[in-house]
């Protein structure tokens, strides 16, 4: 519902810098935090909300690739792991999810 306010402004919206920490190679039968499945499910949920709103014209997840940063209580080690790729540029499941999502032919077929 928070997105609905932005429709009243009558301007196109691009959502950026949204993501979920994921440790590459960690998998689960259910999408538990830090698994690659959780990251994909997180994006599916957020993007489902975006897809329902015609004024949303774009998206850019945070981040392209994992990167070093300071430690924090909600972070595994000293690395921001919200990347679609690892620091070595190995794709995570989310990279494949976005490849499929962004490969659709129609501009409004997100």
Locations of the language-model features?
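Substrate-binding clefts and catalytic carboxylate motifs of secreted carbohydrate-active enzymes
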Residues: 1-110
């Amino acid at each position: 519902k928070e997105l609905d306010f932005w429709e009243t402004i009558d301007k196109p919206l691009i959502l950026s810098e949204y993501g979920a920490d994921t440790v590459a190679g960690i998998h689960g039968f259910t999408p538990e935090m830090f698994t690659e499945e959780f990251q994909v499910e997180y994006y599916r949920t957020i993007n489902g909300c975006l897809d329902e709103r015609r004024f949303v014209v774009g998206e850019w997840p945070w981040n392209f690739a994992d990167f070093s940063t300071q430690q924090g209580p909600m972070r595994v080690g000293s690395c921001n792991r919200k990347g679609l790729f690892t620091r070595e540029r190995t794709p995570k499941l989310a990279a494949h999810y976005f490849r499929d999502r962004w490969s659709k032919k129609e501009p409004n077929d997100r």
